[in-house]
Amino acid sequence: MFEKLKISLIEAPIIKKGDYNYFVHPITDGVPLVDPDVLKEAAEGIKKFGNLNVDKIVCVEAMGIHIATALSIITGIPFVVIRKRQYGLEGEVAVHQITGYSHGELYINGLKKGDKIILVDDVVSTGGTMIAVLKAMEKMGIEIVDVFAIVEKGEGKYIVEGETGFEVKSLVKVNVVDGKVQIEGSRDEN
């Protein structure tokens, strides 16, 4: 299961951002080319292993958008994008996020107290974005039913779980060793 996803990850180039090993992959970066079969595998994986007893799918701009779109199409569940741009809409909530390689503001719109959601993202690595977004949604009274990243890298999953109490599911666990992506496990092996 997830063979195309795994192969595409193994073949992904690595770039350094300071001390951070960053792999460049279509699901996590939108470049060089997004293979619809890989995207479909990812969406089908969330559909199979995620809890979709929700009102809305939530993703974070930018690399969660195509995942949420594909999942929305195959499930019929609408999605909300947490944006990097402020709109000033009524009820908008600003969130400060810090990752291993950037920081900035995110803005939540389209969610209200009592909404049941699944948060989907491309990768959990340092955990900074997920922690900030989960804490903000919890403060808003959003019912977080599930949290899902396509790719798990490093200790980010455990950092998020420790900081928020929410389990983070993933399809594939990877690490960068000697300048290459290595698959350390996948949900289909559990």
UniProtKB/Swiss-Prot annotation:
Catalytic activity: IMP + diphosphate = hypoxanthine + 5-phospho-alpha-D-ribose 1-diphosphate; GMP + diphosphate = guanine + 5-phospho-alpha-D-ribose 1-diphosphate
Functional pathway: Purine metabolism; IMP biosynthesis via salvage pathway; IMP from hypoxanthine: step 1/1
GO annotation, biological process: IMP salvage; purine ribonucleoside salvage
Subcellular location: Cytoplasm
EC code: 2.4.2.8
A cellular component term, taken from the record's GO annotations: cytoplasm
A Pfam family of this chain: Pribosyltran
Record-level Gene Ontology MF annotations: guanine phosphoribosyltransferase activity; hypoxanthine phosphoribosyltransferase activity
PROSITE patterns in UniProt: PUR_PYR_PR_TRANSFER
Entry keyword DNA-binding: no
InterPro entries in UniProt: HGPRTase-like, PRibTrfase_dom, PRTase-like, Pur/Pyrimidine_PRTase
Keyword terms: Cytoplasm, Glycosyltransferase, Purine salvage, Transferase
Classification via SUPFAM superfamilies: PRTase-like
PANTHER family, sorted: HYPOXANTHINE/GUANINE PHOSPHORIBOSYLTRANSFERASE (PTHR43864), XANTHINE PHOSPHORIBOSYLTRANSFERASE (PTHR43864:SF1)
Subunit structure: Homodimer.
Function comment: Catalyzes a salvage reaction resulting in the formation of IMP that is energically less costly than de novo synthesis.
Homology family: Belongs to the purine/pyrimidine phosphoribosyltransferase family. Archaeal HPRT subfamily.
HAMAP family for the chain: Hypx_phosphoribosyltr
Protein name listed in UniProt: Hypoxanthine/guanine phosphoribosyltransferase
